[in-house]
Amino acid sequence: MTVLVTGATGNIGRMVVTELHRLGAHDVRALTVDPGRAALPAGVTVFRGHRGRPATVVPAREGVHVMYLAPHLPTVTEICRLAAAAGVGHIVDLAGPRGGIWQPIEDAVEACGVPWTHLEPGEFMANATLWSAQLRAGDVIRDAYPDAVNAPIAQEDVARVAAHALLAPGRPGNAYPLTGPEALSRRQMVTLLGEALGRPLHYLELPRAQALAVFTEVQGVAANWYLDGLAALTAHPQTTLHPSSHITGQPATTYLDWARTHAHLFQ
């Protein structure tokens, strides 16, 4: 079975390729803009191309049985059309919570007629890197909405679900909401980061206007969207869990384990 991974050197795409290799997939194709610098596992066939330029996907799609579709809204309809024309038998797409900004990906995949699996993760644990500069400067996190609650997921766990869906026969037609294994407040996340880093951390609650100024320097115009999300999670805490373990059978990554593995991002 031939598997094509688009966005293969992106954060999650690279993890999908690695997980497919670990699971013993023998015919993996990786689409990336710079094959010479891809540094992917031995045995992976690397194609030059980008899902943002659909014509470059054409050589890689021929003979493909299943495809991992990394998110790219501007060209998703054309990429799906090309996959259908090439006879791809199953698309596993990375979108987001149903009805959110990534919904057009699921709509395009379903419209093209190829059997599908939707991956719908919420927030990634890696979003904690928004605090990296603050942690390098000291032990205080300045942010708003300390009581916002959700269950962020490790990107590695999303990749494991993607690889499972790509290799499991007869499983299309599922939409998988994905979270981490525990619901945590922002304040609790900071406490766990401190445990991983070996020093106590403090969450200093800022008024929204001050937090907007802080995070506009980090995120630009996305800072408003970030704070809107925290406000929503304060009013409506996300406590329903959909851990990857329910699909893969492997333990889902806890926030503390993720923080210990990625402590270098904050030092």
Segments the model singles out, each with a brief description of its role:
Residues 48-50:
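Cofactor-binding loops of NAD(P)H-dependent oxidoreductases
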